Amino acid sequence: MSFDTAKYPTLALVETPDELRLLPKDSLPKLCDELRQYLLDSVSRSSGHFASGLGTVELTVALHYVYNTPFDHLVWDVGHQAYPHKILTGRRDRISTIRQKGGLHPFPWRDESEYDVLSVGHSSTSISAGLGMAVAAEREGKGRRTVCVIGDGAITAGMAFEAMNHAGDIRSDLLVVLNDNEMSISENVGALNNHLAQLLSGKLYASLREGGKKVLSGLPPIKELVKRTEEHLKGMVVPGTLFEELGFNYIGPVDGHDVQALAHTLKNMRSLKGPQLLHIMTKKGKGYAPAEQDPISWHAVPKFDPASGTLPKSKEGAQPTYSKIFGQWLQETAAKDSKLMAITPAMREGSGMVQFSRDYPQQYFDVAIAEQHAVTFAAGLAVGGYHPVVAIYSTFLQRAYDQVIHDVAIQNLPVLFAIDRGGIVGADGQTHQGAFDLSFLRCIPNMIIMTPSDENECRQMLHTGYHYQKGPTAVRYPRGNGTGTELTPLSELPIGKGVVRRQGETIAILNFGTLLPEAQIAAEKLNATLVDMRFVKPLDEALLEELAQSHSTFVTLEENAIMGGAGSGVNEFLMAKRLAVSVLNIGLPDVFIPQGSQEEIRADLGLDAAGIERKITQWME
């Protein structure tokens, strides 16, 4: 996509924030209009996160206009909303490559630009990192300022409050901008969000603000003071807010789409000392009516036609996603068991739980972005005699590792972890690949871990884990569609038993997970035995011993880090039993895997059928 200077005459003048700061203030609204339109044109052609960026156009322009970036540090939380930031910081002409192999990173990324001071992707990290930068800036003594932008969903996480509590204690100069669009990926929950959403419409707030302005503006000597401290008058209306109790000077709420007023407010705040919190109200999807009306569906989008106002529908006959299979299993199980309790940390849509949340609202809990709480909450439900299911992405389960060990596994509580997005996720890059869950779960005592090879096996494993009441279980499945296999009635699988799918000679391919179709092709060409191992823990030790008697080579296959993964478990067993079998471990290498489509990444890593065959052939030479 070439940049059309005639269509975007003001944006054409702004390649970097230095050029932005040369513009007269009255041209900023025009710049925002063009920036929003350019974002729409670009993302509709390339796919990507969409609604969040539309809502932060004015904030992004105002921040770069007022603050001396990159000398001043601007820290974005999560990064979904940072597309306008990328466009204004030297990456305008490459924005159409975002989330693609070799293209712009989907989130702010330190290796990509000096304006991206923190690499992000997971939520609620900005204030902690920003506080560290603010302390470093104080020691440096050069007047560097630090600003953190965090959304109303991300600020509900415990880490954000830990950071604010610390900031209020040490009193470093730090600005936190709370971007309140009343809508994170799933609807926000909890008393804090209700409080924030009600502030702007309060009659007391509005009348006191206007009354205070009239009284003070009638005194000529302090007119300028009124301009500089109007924000403080707003803060006076809500004394004792949670933020002020944490030691922040709370200012707001203010209109996040009035770029000139926002720039004025930020300019005033730049000189304030100590921790400051600016609360802005924005509209997710601002400027594009379909996204404003349905910001959840338009949060992340495929390529689409902006004129149609609709997203492309799934292809007819497409196989169901694993997330949908999970949601259907939840429905089927809840219909028979009122003690099922399903828990998600703010990922209702992505985890396939929308219909379940509507049909079984009393058995559904969205705990917001609070993975640690989600796991320990599940532990409490299990203690109380209920049957909790924690639906969580692999990459986000990392955030609750201690809770899995301390609150669930040590107490041997029957909690089922439905781990979505295991393995290669694709376009979201390093922060979202599900590369480590088998490794970090396998070493936990009492944990049973299952890896389905297709959607029917996924259903059966969820059923098996749910009815296993002797301790915690995990079923780990990928992003994407199933294979089209027939769905059979639910029945419990024997724990720790694999299935031989093909009988061959010399080589036994031990598959863990959904790479089975690729392994099948390689096995046919190599005349290898193919085993669907099903269980990472416990391993089918009897089957491994049997195979070791008739095969000289084992090849373990998994879409997880090789280090510590399922293949490592096979190695450990063979060594412990002194079984003389050569082993090739195939999986994810010891690197953070960048963005690309799932197919591109698997091909690059040799995890497609041709790559698996090639790795085995080369190793056997």
Swiss-Prot record:
Keywords from the named record: Isoprene biosynthesis, Magnesium, Metal-binding, Thiamine biosynthesis, Thiamine pyrophosphate, Transferase
PROSITE patterns, per database record: TRANSKETOLASE_1, TRANSKETOLASE_2
Cofactor(s) in the UniProt record: Mg(2+); thiamine diphosphate
Reaction catalysed by this enzyme: D-glyceraldehyde 3-phosphate + pyruvate + H(+) = 1-deoxy-D-xylulose 5-phosphate + CO2
InterPro entries attached to this UniProt entry: Dxylulose-5-P_synthase, THDP-binding, Transketo_C/PFOR_II, Transketolase-like_Pyr-bd, Transketolase_BS, Transketolase_C, Transketolase_CS
A GO MF term: thiamine pyrophosphate binding
GO CC entries: cytosol
Broad enzyme group: transferase
EC code: 2.2.1.7
SUPFAM superfamilies: Thiamin diphosphate-binding fold (THDP-binding), TK C-terminal domain-like
Protein purpose: Catalyzes the acyloin condensation reaction between C atoms 2 and 3 of pyruvate and glyceraldehyde 3-phosphate to yield 1-deoxy-D-xylulose-5-phosphate (DXP).
Family according to the record: Belongs to the transketolase family. DXPS subfamily.
Subunit and partners: Homodimer.
Protein name in UniProt: 1-deoxy-D-xylulose-5-phosphate synthase
